[in-house]
Amino acid sequence: IPVALRQLQLISQHATQQANGFFAGRLARLWQDIHWGSLLFLSPLWPIALTHPQLLEEWELRVIHKGESARKVEKQLFGVRLLDICLALVDIWRLPIWVQQGYRLLLNEQRELVKVLRIARDSDHPLRQQNRLDDDPTLRRWLNQPANTVLLANGLALSAQQSWDGPHSQRWQFLTGLYLQISMDEVQQQLHQQAANSAR
């Protein structure tokens, strides 16, 4: 098995553990949707990792480590955005609807994501966060969609692969804290606890 595929499958398992730890208990009746959506979210990348692992390795090197524009690198390596490939495969394979919603959000709802992230970063002032969400009920509904758990779990798992305390990882931690209405300390404590549990 190519390293890139093994790495993606480990990230998918990690995402499932994060989803179960953070969300399954709170949304018990949706446990299966959360579990399978989290596990299968990155599956559209598995065939590329199996047949052309060097492309994903080059993407990781250039985008993650060197900070090049993802859009530009993906155009050169794949001819289209990687998210477009993933969404097309999600549709063809008829993967769970929450997986589809996650990719659609990343492709088409970036404005909402940025707004929510701005609110999430204000984690030291939960009352102010609450007021800002109360002032924008449409954004609150958008944030509170159960399908977002799949994206949050994969965001946490993917970013942890790069760095536990890097800016990318913190973004997903802030968003998870806002979604669950818990502090960053609680998010980080749960992250480390779940990492320790999965290492056993």
Over which residues does each language-model region extend?
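Active-site flanking loop/helix segments enriched in acidic
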Residues: 1-9, 67-73
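Alpha-helical phosphate/pyrophosphate-handling elements in metalloenzyme active cores
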Residues: 5-37
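Metal-dependent nucleotide-binding catalytic modules
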Residues: 29, 42-200
